Structures are given as C-alpha cells and as structure tokens.
C-alpha cells in the first residue's frame, strides 16, 4: 500500500511539472495588470553610476503623476533573455526619455556583476539594486526578465 501511495505522489508531481512546462511564460497572468491595480511603491538604492543624476535612492511614488514608467526586472545571470533585451530597452530609453521613464531593477544579483552588465550594455537609464528580490515579490514577478508598464496615475497597465 505504501509503495502505491509513493508512486501516486511521484506521478502527480510529475504531471504538475509537465503541465507547468507547457505554459507560455509570456501568457502568465498578472493580477496587478488585469485589475489595473496601483503599482506597489518601493524605495531602493540606485547603483553607483546613477547616483550623481538621480540621488542615492529611487522612490517610485516620487515619479508618479509625471509620465508613464517602464519598470524592468533583470539580473546579470539571466542569459540569454536579459542580454537580448538590454540593448532594446536602452535604445527605447534614448528615443523616448522625455515621454517615458525607464527604470531597471537588478534583482537577486551581486552588485559587482550588475555593474559589469550595465557597463557591457552602456545602460544610461536609472538602475536600482534589490539583492533580495523583495520588490519583485510585491509585483508578483515570475522570473527575470520581467517588465511592468505603469501609467501616469501609478496603475499597472501590462506585464
């Protein structure tokens, strides 16, 4: 009897794993976006290259009401996806910086590795540091990279 129970548990877990792997991560729902909920506020330290222009810390609430925000979660160990999208985000920032604020959130990473990544791609939009990934949890992030689009009023429009 005990053997059958163990086999049943293994089969059930295997089935759940298989089902999860069939899902398209781009189609995973975001409750924040679906219900246009307010973006969770946060204050995080800016990485050193951005402090002269943006200050020591970045607080989301200080930037609401001015322009939409593109909030991108990334990590240096996120390969190849983060490496592929970094130049696209930088080009978009350079093209639309007057209309849209881009903010990078380096998450669950080592600061030295994050700085190396930033230098490699010449990222000029502000980058904050969240080594424990707490802000990503507040946003319901599934993994990196993940980008949230926040309107002027501070509501999450899309993920």
Residue ranges and their predicted role:
Residues 73-91:
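Conserved redox-active cysteine motifs that mediate thiol-disulfide chemistry
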Residues 67-69, 74-78, 143:
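Short pre-active-site segment immediately N-terminal to redox-active cysteine/selenocysteine motifs
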Residues 67-68, 85-106, 119-120:
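Conserved helix-turn-beta segment immediately C-terminal to the redox Cys motif
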Residues 75, 107, 130:
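Active-site loop/turn elements of alpha/beta-hydrolase fold enzymes
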Residues 43-69, 94:
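A short beta-strand-turn-helix
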Residues 1-49:
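N-terminal targeting signals for export/organelle localization
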Residues 65, 116-124, 129-159:
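Thiol/disulfide oxidoreductase modules built on the thioredoxin-like
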């Amino acid at each position: 009897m005990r053997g059958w129970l163990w086999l049943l548990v293994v089969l059930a877990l295997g089935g759940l794993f298989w089902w999860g792997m069939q899902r398209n991560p781009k189609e995973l729902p975001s409750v924040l976006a679906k219900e246009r909920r307010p973006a969770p506020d946060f204050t995080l330290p800016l990485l050193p290259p951005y402090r002269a222009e943006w200050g020591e810390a970045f607080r989301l609430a200080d930037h609401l009401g001015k322009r939409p925000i593109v909030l991108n979660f990334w990590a240096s160990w996120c390969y190849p996806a983060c490496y592929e999208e970094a130049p696209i985000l930088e080009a978009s920032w350079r093209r639309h910086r007057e209309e849209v604020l881009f903010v990078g959130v380096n998450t669950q990473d080592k600061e030295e590795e994050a700085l190396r990544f930033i230098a490699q791609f010449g990222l000029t939009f502000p980058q904050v540091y969240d080594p424990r990934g707490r802000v990503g949890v507040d946003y319901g992030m599934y993994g990196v990279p993940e980008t949230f689009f926040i309107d002027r009023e501070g509501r999450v429009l899309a993920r």
